[in-house]
Amino acid sequence: MLSRLSERCSIATGLEQVLRRHVWSAAWLRDAEPAAAASQNIDLSCLMERAGRAAYDVFSNLYTSQQHWLILVGSGNNGGDGYVIARHAREAGKIVTVLCMPHSKPLPAEAASAQHAWKAVGGTETTMNPGAPLQLPADVDLIVDGLLGTGICGPPREQYEDVIRHINGLPVPRVAIDIPSGLNAETGEVAGACVKADHTATFICLKPGLLTGQAKDYVGQLHYRSLGLEDWMTAPERMRAALCRRVALDDVYEYFGIRRSALAHKGRCGKVILVGGDHGFGGATLMSAEACVTVGAGLTRVLTRPEYAAPLLTRCPEAMVTAVETDTGGQLEQQMLAAFEWASTLAVGPGLGTGAYGQAALTAALRHAEVHQDKTLVLDADALNLLAGRLHGKEGGAAAGAGKHLPVLPNSIITPHPGEAARLLACRVADVEKDRLAAARRLAAILGGTCLLKGPGTIVHCHSSAKTAIVDAGNAGMASGGMGDVLTGLLAGLAAQRMHDTFNTTCAGALVHGVAADMVAAEDGRGTRGIRATELIHRVPLIVNASGPSPATRQRSSGP
């Protein structure tokens, strides 16, 4: 099944594969483009020609039967790419209609050159009339978006928004040049109207806004083209300028390519304690435990309420269960501290609740992890809500220190969804989603460890190393209860095995989680609606034991 996912990927050269695994700021690229062109002994107009031609090749291969292309050009270099596409489409025998936005300033030199070349082959254009209804030829069967580029911040101007909303409502395929108009290339924020593209062709490097935030709803399928700049982009100084890693399907082979030693035994494969399952929330720890066992942890023990011991052992007899009966805070904490001595990895949160049981579990976990800095501590769900209370003096946090004594835990992993992140940062969910990369950095600083910020385009950030990754796997079917509990188990089980450092363990766990969901969705064309969290667990062994790809398969890209 994993190989079938790989088979859907496009062919890429070795250096292109390197570039597809990294992400650069759009602002950095705009500043670097003159040097990039100079490295090829060409000017920026020639670089624009390469971009337009690359986009035309992508779109024409995707839409071989579309005969009337509508190309919308703005007043910047994105519009210049549109003129190049228009020229190539016309030369290929397509009917081409070019509509341009009115602009008070002259076009940039490169865009003006592309416009001149379009007109030189007999091309024409029509300037749109702001406020007037948009009149389009009835037989248009492909719309090419070249309105706005990577420099946009905030909502488009009203005249652009009107056009964007109009074309989004048409039953015609839409493709975007470099980035859908209205999408923030740095953050993935959509502050106003944004083109909903079926496909996007982007150039030279991947930008963060194409992979996270609201991007998944607007980019469609992403196609990356390096424009012949692979050697220049992979030079050490450019690689050091990369903003973050992109973690995707091919990285499965990097994370899990080393086989387990034939001399391994359960004691060497890690001892995990999972704490959760307060009264009324027993299913969460069950799913976490099953995921932890399935991903390869040597020994897994669950601390939960007595009523969940039998169901858990029935469903997952490989796990051990310790029933926590007392409701007295001090006794709870002491019982948990004693149990934690056995473990090499702790995970606290699934079904934890925010009462005395949860408070005691979090206090004990933080105390133990502060003393045993070599152990990994995973915090999720109500453990994060309780942590937020301590940070901001709410819900009993004052009694627990109100954030005054939070330890620095470099090996900790916190896994908030946007709502939990907002509580931890004392802000609105919209503030988290406005810039997910910045939010992840702030979240990781709380305990000085690694943050996994959930959501489309999961962000992983390590505070101590300042490393960041965007995990490009998973789908909308993961919007269901229990998914986070499965992730917690995966992270704890992987951390216990000590295959990688905490940052890479977190990336690997998020990748396994997302790829498992993609496998479920791809099976027999099932789709994303109605995926259950427990279904992911059964795909995990296929991922973590995936054979390395053949040399031919290694040339395939797991994404754009």
Curated annotation (Swiss-Prot):
ADP binds at residues 454-458, 475-484. K(+) binds at residues 78, 145, 181. Residues 417-423 are annotated as: NADPHX 2. Residues 1-241 are annotated as: NAD(P)H-hydrate epimerase. Residues 249-560 are annotated as: ADP-dependent (S)-NAD(P)H-hydrate dehydratase. Its EC number is 4.2.1.136, 5.1.99.6. (6S)-NADPHX 2 binds at residues 351, 485. Keywords: ATP-binding, Isomerase, Lyase, Metal-binding, Multifunctional enzyme, NAD, NADP, Nucleotide-binding, Potassium. Residues 29-235 form the YjeF N-terminal domain. InterPro entries: Carbohydrate_kinase_pred_CS, CARKD, Nnr, Ribokinase-like, YjeF_N_dom, YjeF_N_dom_sf. SUPFAM superfamilies: Ribokinase-like, YjeF N-terminal domain-like. Residues 77-81, 149-155 are annotated as: NADPHX 1. GO terms for biological process: metabolite repair; nicotinamide nucleotide metabolic process. Residues 249-547 form the YjeF C-terminal domain. (6S)-NADPHX 1 binds at residues 160, 178. Binds 1 potassium ion per subunit. It holds the Pfam family Carb_kinase. One of its GO terms (molecular function) is NAD(P)HX epimerase activity. Its cofactor is K(+). It catalyses: (6S)-NADHX + ADP = AMP + phosphate + NADH + H(+); (6S)-NADPHX + ADP = AMP + phosphate + NADPH + H(+); (6R)-NADHX = (6S)-NADHX; (6R)-NADPHX = (6S)-NADPHX. Bifunctional enzyme that catalyzes the epimerization of the S- and R-forms of NAD(P)HX and the dehydration of the S-form of NAD(P)HX at the expense of ADP, which is converted to AMP. This allows the repair of both epimers of NAD(P)HX, a damaged form of NAD(P)H that is a result of enzymatic or heat-dependent hydration. HAMAP family: NADHX_dehydratase (MF_01965), NADHX_epimerase (MF_01966). In the N-terminal section; belongs to the NnrE/AIBP family. This is Bifunctional NAD(P)H-hydrate repair enzyme. It comes from Leishmania infantum.
